[in-house]
């Protein structure tokens, strides 16, 4: 038995938790460089605002409607997500963190001693008490059904109190008959059009199809979806995320970059962040690549995009090695006379910690004390905030940095941003 817990309007809700004065007002969160809307509060959705709308086109409309806009505060969202997930882990035997605002919970054995709907309400109340965030809870025998139950809990929140238990077969079928097939988890737009052409309009229609025919005309993934809709578990709970095969750190610049030194600072920063992520995965890498590009949509400007890569003989997780390799790649592809829109660093060819072997012919032998130095670097930046300790090459006044003109305070991770109570 699974429960899917999903925070309602997560990004927007994180902003309003610390701003009670915004209660009842429409709130939107913008993407990198304040480009477009990526999250809306319920009040904003009622005004017809949808994710993907360019901010510069809607700016005047937002002003007239009293919409409050925020730049993306990823540090705040990550910490609030961690608080939600920690709460869930205390309440259920196992948790799979599916995304920043969603988690599948294992309810095996819970129904033997608790009513599942009551337990769902307890999850909701506990998360609300500890984080002031509201979650929808969908309970069912499979992940796919739990997704649909969660969808119903949020769509009909007033009638369901935010909790839907689909363990009853009759209730399952009634809900499946109401859900369009395109709203089923794992059914994309292209597949849903093909299903509609075959007369399969609802989730119930899909659940009643022959698995053999579905597999023959579509694929094994959709066959699993059909089985899951019938209450047959095909997707197990994954407590540990699979090891990453690559790490990419890139951003569009707040302003176009034309100066090599500014680009070098950006590549320094992206490489340092990628190395930090690599150590967080307990991995070493051999492949380091840097890319730069101008905007493909710029008028009267020639497009330029290029990348270069370095393969090390000995795997590393030292920021200094990765930065040096990334800058060497930049030197190969940098061309004067362009207005660059974006750059990034990619790491690949990973080795697990303790598996990496030295190479007799490698001129760049591992640095003495590298592991301890990187540990201190990561510890200070985790304890006192990102950027507490950084490389000089990253620069101090980063003109190229991502534009976030409406950034809220990092209320939960920076002492300087703690709320002051009068």
UniProtKB/Swiss-Prot annotation:
One of its GO terms (molecular function) is damaged DNA binding. GO terms for biological process: error-prone translesion synthesis; SOS response. The keyword Cell division does not apply. It comes from the Bacteria. It comes from Salmonella typhimurium (strain LT2 / SGSC1412 / ATCC 700720). This is Protein UmuC. The gene is umuC. The keyword Protease does not apply. CDD domains: PolY_Pol_V_umuC. PROSITE patterns: UMUC. Residues 2-188 form the UmuC domain. Involved in UV protection and mutation. Essential for induced (or SOS) mutagenesis. May modify the DNA replication machinery to allow bypass synthesis across a damaged template. Belongs to the DNA polymerase type-Y family. It holds the Pfam family DUF4113. Transmembrane segments: none annotated. Keywords: DNA damage, DNA repair, SOS mutagenesis, SOS response.
């Amino acid at each position: 038995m699974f429960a899917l817990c999903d925070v309602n309007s997560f990004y927007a809700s994180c902003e309003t938790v610390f701003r009670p004065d915004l209660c009842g007002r429409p709130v939107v969160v913008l993407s990198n460089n304040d480009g477009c809307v990526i999250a809306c509060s319920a009040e904003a959705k009622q005004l017809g605002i949808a994710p993907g709308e360019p901010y510069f086109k809607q700016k005047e409309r937002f002003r007239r409607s009293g919409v409050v806009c925020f730049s993306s505060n990823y540090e705040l969202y990550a910490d609030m997500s961690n608080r939600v997930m920690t709460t869930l882990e205390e309440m259920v035997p196992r948790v799979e963190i599916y995304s920043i605002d969603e988690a599948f919970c294992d309810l095996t054995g819970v129904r033997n001693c608790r009513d599942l709907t009551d337990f769902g309400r307890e999850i909701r109340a506990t998360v609300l008490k500890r984080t002031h965030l509201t979650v929808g809870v969908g309970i069912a025998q499979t992940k796919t059904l739990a997704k649909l139950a969660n969808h119903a809990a949020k769509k009909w929140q007033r009638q369901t109190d935010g909790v839907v238990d689909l363990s009853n077969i009759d209730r399952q079928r009634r809900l499946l008959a109401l859900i369009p097939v395109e709203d089923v988890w794992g059914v994309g737009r292209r597949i849903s059009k093909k299903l509609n052409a075959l007369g399969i309009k609802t989730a119930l229609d899909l659940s009643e199809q022959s698995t053999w025919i579905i597999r023959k005309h579509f694929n094994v993934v959709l066959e699993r979806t059909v089985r899951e809709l019938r209450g047959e578990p095909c997707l197990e709970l994954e407590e540990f995320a699979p090891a990453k095969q690559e790490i990419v750190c890139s951003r569009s610049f707040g302003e176009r970059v034309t100066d090599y030194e500014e680009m070098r600072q950006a590549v320094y920063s992206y490489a340092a962040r990628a190395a930090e992520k690599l150590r967080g995965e307990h991995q070493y890498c051999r492949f380091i690549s840097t890319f730069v590009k101008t905007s493909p949509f710029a008028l009267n400007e020639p497009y330029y995009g290029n990348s270069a890569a370095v393969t090390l003989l000995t795997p590393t997780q030292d920021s200094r090695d990765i930065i040096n390799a990334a800058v060497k790649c930049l030197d190969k592809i940098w061309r004067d006379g362009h207005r660059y829109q974006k750059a990034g660093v990619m790491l690949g060819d990973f080795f697990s910690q303790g598996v990496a072997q030295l190479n007799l012919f490698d001129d760049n032998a591992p640095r003495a004390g590298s592991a301890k130095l990187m540990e201190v670097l990561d510890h200070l930046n985790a304890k006192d905030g990102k950027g507490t300790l950084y490389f000089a090459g990253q620069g101090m006044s980063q003109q190229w940095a991502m534009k976030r003109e409406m950034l809220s305070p990092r209320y939960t991770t920076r002492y300087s941003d703690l709320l002051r109570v009068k």
